[in-house]
Amino acid sequence: VFQFLERGDWLWFRPRADGAITRASAMPGVPPELDLSVRAACLLQQAAGIRQGATLRIVKRLPLGGGVGGGSSDAATTLVALNEVWRAGLTLTELAALGLTLGADVPVFVHGHAAWAEGVGEQLTPLELAEPWFVVLVPTCAVATGAVFNDPDLTRNSPPITIADFMAGE
């Protein structure tokens, strides 16, 4: 289940005529070529045949490697925003498909609502959940989501749960 929080990173986009994709703000430990937002901008630019570029400015308010989808939501925001800025004309479904190549949880952020996810994150069923309270803790270490899910020691024998079981509280 993906539940959205009323907290997130702040992103700004400035179009460029020279076709370059650049960051206006440094992110310690994340070179531009590994930044999901930069990668999302480059992916959209290539997929839509866009000649313009963009300067991205990101103020991180969510912890890096904290497991709350900060990088994925930034990538999704980049796809949706630059699709508008560049007038690329892609649908949300097309943007979500592009986002899936960046990370399994990018599509849910492209669609922008709470959802039950199946598959690797691309099969989404919208949910209306009660408005709970959340506490976001900032860990003293960062963990790459991809590394966790690709680790051979990850337990993969959990029984599947259905959306009906989840909604029933089972």
Predicted regions and their residues:
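Conserved, helical-rich catalytic subdomain that frames metal- and/or nucleotide-binding sites
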Residues: 13, 110-111, 116-170
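Solvent-exposed alpha-helices and their adjacent loops that cap or buttress functional pockets
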Residues: 3-4, 100-101, 107-110, 126-130
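ATP-binding N-lobe of GHMP and related small-molecule kinases
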Residues: 1-65, 84-93, 134, 138-141
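Contiguous, small/hydrophobic- and glycine-enriched helical/loop subdomains that border
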Residues: 75, 79-117
